[in-house]
UniProtKB/Swiss-Prot annotation:
Name of the protein in its database record: Small ribosomal subunit protein uS17
GO CC, one annotated term: cytosolic small ribosomal subunit
Any GO molecular function: rRNA binding
Organism domain of life: Bacteria
Pfam families in the cross-refs: Ribosomal_S17
Lineage summary: Bacteria, Pseudomonadati, Campylobacterota, Epsilonproteobacteria, Campylobacterales
Primary role: One of the primary rRNA binding proteins, it binds specifically to the 5'-end of 16S ribosomal RNA.
């Protein structure tokens, strides 16, 4: 039997808020080319992530991986802290 591991999204961003126990909000920036004007535009999106050990602080640059929905807004868990206190 050939079991395939499901593809999970990996996002990297800066922690902008630590509002509750085991939760944090990260801001992910991506660059896209504007369809009409062909200019590179920055787009931002906020993700609520699950931090099981309460180890992130505001300003850290972290990596998060997609998981099953943990609450209404949380679908990502902390994978690793890339840079402490950016």
């Amino acid at each position: 039997m050939n079991t395939k591991e499901p593809h999970k999204r990996l996002v990297q961003g800066k922690v902008i808020s630590k509002f509750a126990e085991k939760s944090a909000v990260i801001l992910v920036e991506r660059k896209v080319v504007h369809e009409k004007y062909r200019k590179i535009v920055k787009k931002f999106k906020k993700y609520t992530i699950h931090d099981e050990n309460n180890q992130v602080k505001v300003g850290d640059f972290v990596s998060a991986i997609e998981c099953r929905p943990l609450s209404k807004t949380k679908s990502f868990t902390l994978k690793e802290i890339l840079v402490v206190g950016v």
